[in-house]
Amino acid sequence: MSLSGSDSHLAVSPTLAEDMNSSDTSAGLAETPPADEEKRSIVDTGESVVAMNEPHIVDWDGPDDPGNPVNFSRHIKITNVGIVSALTFITPLASSMFAPGVPQLMEEFHSSSRLLAGFVVSVYVLGFAIGPLILAPASELLGRVPIYHICNICFTVFSIACALSTNLGMLIAFRFFQGCFGSAPVTNGGGTIADLIVQEKRGGVIAIYALGPLLGPVIGPVAGGYLAAARGWRWVFWVLAIVGGGCTLASFLFLRETYPMVLLKRKTQRLIQETGNTHLRSKNDNGMSTRQRFVQAIVRPSRILFRSPIVAASSVYVGIVYGYQYLMFSTFTYVFEDQYAFPTSSAGLTFLGTGVGSLLGLFVIGAVSDRILKAKSKPTPEAPSGAMKPEYRLPPLVWGAFFIPAGLFMYGWSAYYRTHWIVPIIGTGLVGIGNIAVFMCITSYLVDAFTIFAASALAANTVVRSILGALLPMAGQSMYDSMGLGWGNSLLGFIAVVCIPIPWAMMRYGERMREAFDGATIFTIFSGSVSVTRSTFT
């Protein structure tokens, strides 16, 4: 990537998704000299690297600069990833932990509406769709840590507000805002991992991070069922507030800023104070005003979604799978209480089938993902130096896509004929394997392909999947009432079968789609005076 001072052209790196060990990739934008200069001399200030041909440009102090997030100590990386992963577990946990207590809630507020009973759960996921539109670009403008802190505090506050709600309208409103602020770790966590972890080691880390969005909604109803039965539905929110408050405190104590652009900006400001040279600027500074950068950051996720066919296709596929998960979650309580006469406390245990399947898929995919990447990126006669491509993350996705329809058919017809309760739960386990394959592989793919803009790419993905996750459960009960459990789940299974070619097409044609896609359609929105070259994202 280069920024030429003479013509103010911003170039997006064609190696944007490659090894995060490259400081230029991590920082996002690098400087190259004018065409008539063949050599570049460097002045080492001890705090940064300043190019002699661009004497006011501040860069990293070489590839081993300890200020570069990829060079942070192992302890700092583990601490940051651990806290973010914990947050990414808690906020999805809150999406479904409340579900077993809904019958108590509806009785207390004197409502018998099945629609409202489903919506009071899914409105949280709707908040997950709205929050990323602001939070992801804000993290790329202000940094990761301020967004985490603000959202953690607000999540805790709205959890308390939910516990104190006195009517259904209040609870729905507070649940929505709880979801909006709870989306921060899910949206920005992938960006934090991209900041810290080099590409060839990223698959295993994302496997840990993916536990939250997949297992949180599964474990939530198990704990929530017993808690609601013992102490009432309000205590679900009190527990969330207590845990959220503890994580907020840990974040303030230990979480460290990782976004390279913000860190370079801070270095520049520190150098200005030390040297008195007000002409110094970060190599990422393209001269835009704060307003222009804000507009750029806010609009970027939607542009990525609508202008990048690979992001659009992957987001729709993840959205369908995510919607299926929440549709099934919204019906588990009724299915197993009505069909199998499970008590409220035990009904939550039926969610464990999906959890066990997700864990099994997590261990397998986490073990093979980085191995596949390294094996496929070995040097060949065509590519003597080897090449790591985002598409190398996708083979497990192709395998996992078959588990989703198989699990749906098994769950639907076994529950319809009231076979032993373990059979439909095994079916949900197969769906869980497919879910984790889809979520992990596509998250890794987007992080590898967009790196410094990973938060915006994941935000686009999160918006689509959260909208479907909120809307499909609202239609689920009506579908089951009219079609029955057998044909209702079969309809979902047939749709999943139709979607199987999507991951296959992404793996086979994804690189070609990225190369054909003109990166300027995303990045030229920054400013009328800044033009962007094509990015192949390879």
From Swiss-Prot:
Superkingdom, taxonomy of origin: Eukaryota
InterPro entries linked: MFS, MFS_dom, MFS_trans_sf
Gene3D superfamilies, per the entry: MFS general substrate transporter like domains
Region called Disordered, residue ranges: 1-42
Pfam families listed in its UniProt record: MFS_1
GO CC, alphabetical: membrane
Cellular localization per UniProt: Membrane
Single GO MF descriptor: transmembrane transporter activity
Keywords: Glycoprotein, Membrane, Transmembrane, Transmembrane helix, Transport
Transmembrane regions: 81-101, 115-135, 153-173, 203-223, 235-255, 309-329, 348-368, 394-414, 422-442, 444-464, 485-505
Coiled coil: none
Record's bilayer topology term: Multi-pass membrane protein
Predominant place of localization: membrane
Glycosylation (residues): 21, 71
Cystines in this chain: none
Biological role stated in the UniProt entry: MFS-type transporter; part of the gene cluster that mediates the biosynthesis of talaronoid C, a fusicoccane diterpenoid with an unprecedented tricyclic 5/8/6 ring system.
Family in the record: Belongs to the major facilitator superfamily.
Protein name in the entry: MFS-type transporter tndD
Source organism of the structure: Aspergillus flavipes
